[in-house]
Amino acid sequence: MRLWPLSNDIKSKQFIKIFKRSDGEYESMIQRVYAGLRKLECGADITIATSKSQVSLIHNQLGCDVSVCVEPCRRDTFPAIVLATAYLHDVKGIAEDEVAVVCPVDPYVESDYFDALEKLGALAAAGGANLVLMGIEPTYPSEKYGYIIPTGREPVSGAEAFKEKPDAETAREYIKNGALWNGGVFAYKLGYVLSKAHELIDFEGYEDLYEKYGELEKISFDYAVVEKESRIQVMRFAGQWKDLGTWNTLTEAMGECFVGPAMLDETCSNVHVVNELDVPIVCMGLKDAVVSASPQGILVSDKERSGYIKPYVEKTDRKVMFAEKSWGDYKVIDVGQDSLTIKVTLKPGQKMNYHSHSRRDEVWTVIHGEGRVVIDGEARLVGVGDVVNMPAGCKHTIEALTELNVIEVQLGKDIDVRDKVKSKGGSDEEA
Amino acid sequence: MRLWPLSNDIKSKQFIKIFKRSDGEYESMIQRVYAGLRKLECGADITIATSKSQVSLIHNQLGCDVSVCVEPCRRDTFPAIVLATAYLHDVKGIAEDEVAVVCPVDPYVESDYFDALEKLGALAAAGGANLVLMGIEPTYPSEKYGYIIPTGREPVSGAEAFKEKPDAETAREYIKNGALWNGGVFAYKLGYVLSKAHELIDFEGYEDLYEKYGELEKISFDYAVVEKESRIQVMRFAGQWKDLGTWNTLTEAMGECFVGPAMLDETCSNVHVVNELDVPIVCMGLKDAVVSASPQGILVSDKERSGYIKPYVEKTDRKVMFAEKSWGDYKVIDVGQDSLTIKVTLKPGQKMNYHSHSRRDEVWTVIHGEGRVVIDGEARLVGVGDVVNMPAGCKHTIEALTELNVIEVQLGKDIDVRDKVKSKGGSDEEA
C-alpha cells in the first residue's frame, strides 16, 4: 500500500516492474532475485513459498513452470518455513542432509548478494552449525530491523544475542559494537528444521501439515528456532541490501528518472516518474518529487512525505483496477454505474479457467490476435472484431492462439471479482 | 495548448469547466459569460461568432438553441465582425440603428463587467460616437496587450492614440499617463460597421459575404476601423478582467483547490488540482504546483514554470482523446495497435449524425440507458447489454431515449476521426 498506485490489494511491491535490465526491458524485484539465483554456478533448485493470492502473479512474472509452495492461509514465518521445508522433502524428494537457503524477495540486492547466499549454503553444508545466518552490515541505525549481536568481528562468528527493533540511540550503540541486521536470510539442512518442526507441531508430512495449516500457532521462525539455537553461525555481508518499502527508497534504486511515457523539463531535479498508464506525464519545475500513475490512481508527492501515504490510500476506492494473472493481465478502463469495462491481455498459448458468473453478463470484443473460445461447451475460433455474448450463468473460457487482446464489458449490479464459479470441462486440460 | 491536458486541438480554454457555480456544478468561461449576459435587464439578444470546429462544443455547453454565426474559415477580426454584423442584420433582421456590443469570451470577469457592457451599449445608442470602446484599467505593465491612450481621465473620454504591445518600460510610462488596455470590447450601431464593410469589401449581404469569406483579406478590426475612426469614445472599466491563458492565472481564479477526485495532504500549499479522470489524485508535500489529468495526459508543474509547457505538449501524441459534441461527449479509454475503444455519452433526446466509415469497423455495447439505432436504414430499440455490429461502409446512428452510455470499439488500420461519411436518412429529421 505504501507504493500506491503501483501496488494494490493484490499486487505488492515485489512485483512492480521498475528495474531496467540490460536488454531495455523492465523487471520486478522478484524477477531480479529469481534471475540472480538462476545464474548461480551451484545450480540451486528454486522454490517460492508464497500465499495463494500471489500465485497467479508469480506465474505471470516467472513463468508457469516455476516451483511454488503455497501457504493455504497466512500464518507467521515458522509455519511457512516448516511447510516449505516439508514441501522440499516430501514433494520434491530432497534429502534431509541437503541444504536449504531461505531469502525474502523484499530487499533490493546486487550480484554479490547471490554469491553470499551460495557461501551461506556451503557453510550450512559443512555442518559447523545447525543454522547459518546472514548478518547484514547496517548502513544506518534503523529502528525497523532486528539486530544480531555476533560473538566477534570475524567474517563468520557465533551469535551472542538477538535484539528486536531497538530505538535509534540503542541501535547506534549496537552498531558501534559490531551488531548486524537480521535480514531473515539463513541456511540449514532440511533434517534440522523438520526435527524442530516435529518437536513443536504434531504432523505426519507435507500433506498433513497443509491440511492443518490454518490451525497452526502464529509464531516467527526467529522466536521459535533462531533465538533458542546455540549451534549457530553468523556470516557478515557488507554488500547492497536495501528495503525498498517506500517511494523514497524505491526511487533511489531506479536507474533512470522515469519508467513509462513521461517528459521532465530541465528545471526538474531529483524527480522520478513511474507511469503505467498509456497517456504521457509532463513534469515541470519540480524538486525532490515522485509522480506515479496506474489504473488505480495518481500520486504526486514530495519524496520525504511519500512515506505517509497510507491514510490517504485507505480513503480511496480500493477496488482492484489492474491485475496480473497466470494467463496474462487485465486493467479496468471504465467504471460505469452498473458496468465495468476491462482490457484483457492473454499470452500466446494461455487460457483462463473455464468459469461463469452468477450476477453479471459479459461481452467480449476481440481487438487483437486470434483465439479459441468455449461457450457452454461449444468451441469456436475468434479473431479481430468477433463479439462473444455471455449472459449470467453461461460457462466460458478463452484461449490465446497468438497474443490476444479483448475488451470485456461486464454488466450487472454490484459487480464483484468474487462472483466467479469455476466449472469443469471447457478445454482439453484444466487451466 | 497552454492549458494542456484540459485543452486539446479541439477544446480551447473557454470550454474548460473549472468555475464552481452556486449550485455546486462546474462551468466553463463561455458558460459564465453566457449566463452573465442572459441575466442583463436589457434582455440582450446573444449571438456567438465562432469557427466551425467549435460549434458542437458550443451546442454541448450552451444548448442547441443558442444563436451561432459560423465563420467558414479563420480570417482576422475585421472579417469576423463584419460577418457577424451582417448575420445580425440580414439573418436575424436587426435594424441598422440597433447597437451591437462585441466581447471576447477569453477573459475571466465578474458581474460588474456585464453592467459595463450594458453601459457601453447605451453610449453607442446615444450616438455621441461611432464606436465606443471599453478601456480596461491596467493592473500591471503587460507586454501582451494593446493600449488605448485616452484624451483624459474622465469615465468616458476620447481616444488620442492606440499602441500595440509595448515593452514593459514603455507600458509603465503609458500607465502613468492614464493609458488603458484595449480588451477588444466595443459597441457600435450595425449600420456603422456595415457601411465601413461596404467601403472595404465588395459584397451584397450575409450570404454573399459567407461565400466569399475565404478570399477576404486578413486584417484586424483595430487596424481596419478603430485606429482610423475619429468619432470614438472610451469608457474606463476598473473591475475584474483577467486573461486566464496559463495554468498559473487559471488556478488563481479557481474557488477551491481541486476539481474532480483528489486529496491534498496538510503539507501542500498553494496547490491546485483539476482531474478529469475517474481515478483519484493524491498530492503530498507539494508547494506552488498545479496537477491536472485528462484522457490527453497528466501535467505536474510548478505554477511559474507552467507557462513554458508548449514545446512539451508538441512532443506528445496530439490525437484527440476526448471531445464534447452537440449530442454529448466521448473519451478514448484504450488505444490498441489497430483499435481504439471509446466511451460515448449521449444526452437524452440527442442523436449522432447518420454516418459510415470507409476504413474501420465498429462495435457498440450499450452499458447504460435506452436508445434507438438505425443500421443501414433499419431501426431498432437497444438497451443495456445489446451489441451492434457495424462493418466498414455500414450506415449508422444512435439516438438516446434516456441518457445513454455506449462502449464503442473501433477496428481497423490507421483509425482517424476524419474517416467519416455523412449519409442522408437514418432519422425523421436530419441531425
Regions found by a protein language model. Name each.
Chain A
Residues 1-5, 417:
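Short N-terminal binding/cap micro-motifs at the start of the first secondary-structure element
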Residues 5-9, 19-104, 108-115:
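Conserved N-terminal catalytic core of the sugar/cofactor nucleotidyltransferase
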Residues 407-415:
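C-terminal structural segments of small proteins and small subunits
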Residues 188-388, 394-397, 415, 420-430:
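Left-handed beta-helix
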Residues 45-47, 101, 132-133, 233, ...:
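A structural signal for isolated positions on well-ordered beta-strands in alpha/beta enzyme cores
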Residues 103, 366, 409:
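Catalytic metal- and UDP-sugar-binding loop of GT-A-like glycosyltransferases, i.e.
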Residues 15, 30, 84, 106, ...:
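Residue-level signal for inorganic ion chemistry
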